[in-house]
Design a protein with these regions (language model features):
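Amphipathic alpha-helical segments
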Residues: 1-6, 10, 25-26, 166-204, ...
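Specificity-determining recognition surfaces
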Residues: 50, 138-167
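Short, recurring structural edge motifs at helix starts
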Residues: 2, 15-21, 46-49, 153-154, ...
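Sequence-specific dsDNA recognition surfaces
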Residues: 34-48, 63-92
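Non-catalytic DNA-recognition/assembly elements of restriction-modification systems
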Residues: 19-42, 199
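Short, structured motif recognition centered on aromatic/hydrophobic residues
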Residues: 26-31, 35, 57, 90-91, ...
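A short beta-sheet element
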Residues: 61-62, 76-140
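A short glycine-rich beta-alpha junction/loop motif
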Residues: 100, 114-121, 153-171
Length: 221
């Protein structure tokens, strides 16, 4: 059932954009035009264990980027590790795309300021153009496409590929409505994924209810 719900995610998003716009044209823009800044990070020298011992600075790796809100990291580093590497602080609410290996194409949102390694593309969204959660959902919807762009033995992508990715940019009011609906849908999906077996039937009924609400959503534009 969970796979069915996830497969419907992209269909819902595309259908909602069309329904909410009611036939209006929508511009597709590259992430490089939607972002204030797109950056990557770095890795402090692993040969200097002091950089990693008793650290307090969150340092994100791509295995922690998995279509999620990120409130903490498994590894912490110290300030000299930041200063002596390409690791850089990013503000909260960047949209992060994993660029390397098995995790390529996965996206997440950092909910606290943190640093990242070089395999993360960190998108600081210009919120005069787009809501960061809207950008997140657009990129999550393009996961298979982004993954297909990978090259080399590890199927990596790079910052230039990320900057050229295009997403539809409807008015901010429409973006807000889409985010509100997809946040509810995402919460439901997570509940199904994490629920005990005896709860699955109840969750399925809830899913069917929200599906009906989504398909009958009436927008005020």
């Amino acid at each position: 059932m969970l796979s069915t719900v996830k497969n419907l995610f992209g269909e819902f998003m595309n259908a909602m954009i069309k329904k909410l716009l009611q036939g209006q044209a929508v511009e597709w823009r590259a992430l490089g035009e939607v972002a204030k800044k797109i950056s990557s990070g770095g890795t402090p020298k692993t040969g200097i264990p002091e950089y990693y011992n008793n650290g307090e600075i969150p340092w994100l790796r791509t295995q922690e980027v998995n279509f999620n809100d990120i409130y903490d990291t498994g590894v912490k580093i110290i300030e000299p590790g930041v200063k002596n590497s390409s690791a850089r602080w990013i503000p909260a609410n960047c949209v992060i795309i994993a660029m390397y290996g098995a995790t390529v194409g996965r996206v997440g949102i950092n909910k606290i300021p943190m640093t990242t390694n070089q395999a993360c593309a960190n998108i600081e969204v210009n919120e005069e153009i787009a809501e960061y959660r809207y950008v997140y959902y657009c990129l999550a919807n393009q996961y298979e496409y982004i993954k297909s762009l990978g090259t080399g033995s590890q199927t990596n992508i790079n910052a230039q590929i990320v900057k050229k990715l295009k997403i539809p940019i409807p008015p901010l009011s429409i973006q807000s409505q889409i985010v509100a609906i997809l946040d509810t849908f995402d919460t439901l999906t997570q509940s199904i994924s994490e629920g005990l077996p005896k709860e699955i039937k109840l969750r399925q009924k809830q899913y069917e209810y929200y599906r009906e609400q989504l398909l009958n959503f009436k927008a005020t534009i």
